[in-house]
Amino acid sequence: MKNIITPRVFIAATRQNDGKTTTSLGLLSAIKRYYPRVGYIKPVGQRFVDVEDHKIDEDSFLMDKVFRLNCPLPEMSPIAVASDFTRKYLKSSNNPKLVKRVQQAFDRVAWEKDFVLCEGTGHAGVGSVFDLSNARVAKILNAKVILVTQGGIGRPIDEVALNQALFEKDGVEIIGVILNKVRQDKVDYISEFARKGLERRGLNLL
């Protein structure tokens, strides 16, 4: 990867369906107020649509449609995990080729951009079977992480701790945690105690 200058952040979650894509939509909207030229990449995608003979991750397609990012769609979605992807990988590993694909895609997405938002797939360990876990991809992209988890205190912080261990193992910094799907009448209560629990782990509640 040649681009180590363009600011970037990697959005991950403690589990699937925690609201990572919704969070990414909100963050991109906010970021564009300060950085008009924003790029987006979902390095590893599991659900995709066919666009001009390319398999494009659904979230990449959505972001481009909403924000008109002026990024090449195939580079926003460099690796599409089809049903036979893992089986083929385990038969004949081609990890260096996949890593290079991710790096080159990022460089193209980041070209003449002020900021790039990178979105992961599920929790930190997803993708480990083909050696491209979210933690490793964040490391490859030299990106710090914002972790999204569901509202609550006990279980979310337990899950954050598990994910934190995986990211730290790869030397990736978590810059903050977003609590999603919190009931309106519980926001103040959960925020107070979740913040205390996260601070004990050296993490910030955003």
Task: State each model region's role.
Residues 32-37, 65-72, 107-111, 165-172, ...:
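Generic secondary-structure signature for well-ordered alpha-helical cores
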Residues 120-205:
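Conserved catalytic-core segment of NTP-binding enzymes
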Residues 3, 7-18, 22-101, 108:
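N-terminal phosphate/diphosphate-binding loop that engages ATP/GTP or pyrophosphate donors
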Residues 7-11, 113-118, 145:
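Generic beta-sheet signal
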